Amino acid sequence: MKKLTWSIGMMAVLVFGLIIPSTFAGSSNDEGYSPEMKAKIEETKKELKKFTDERALTAKHLKTFDELDFVVFTNQEWTRLHESHSKDVKVNWPDGHSTKGIDKHIEDLKAMFVYAPDTNIKVHPVKIGSGEWTSVIGVMAGTFTKPMPIGNGKFIQPTGKKYSINMCTMGHWKDGVMVEEWLFWDNATYMKQLGIGN
């Protein structure tokens, strides 16, 4: 973190201390400087562009993720999941298992709405990222109002209890979509709030 802060600080010093004064003097940005200084200025320009491009890419990914949770997930618009997930996306779930492919991911997401049809994510209190990586904290909420399938034709009957849990999603993005996603939440708290945990 200190290294990143220092690098940004140095870029700012060079940009504002060297480039801008020469601009106000009516000369080109690197006119009158030694070859070494010109090289440093060009290097700083490239670093600054790299930094601003990365920030823009991160902002784009986070905007896509907002749309994913607030609209696509909450409203079960599964035909739009490809806007944020690659066809062969790998998804890592809180219980440790992983799945491959968008169709399987849609199937798993649909299952969450079978017993809690009002499941939703409407807020992202924390959103951070760096280039092709993002991490978002959300609040997932809903009400256990329908029978929960547990296999072999068996069901857990609804308790009518509401749940609201903090969750975190980390995403690795390529070409505008996630190629891998990590989901984190406390399953014990989730079950307890649904009224079926110890």
Spell out what each predicted region is:
Residues L4-W6, S22-N198:
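C-terminal and inter-domain tail/linker signature
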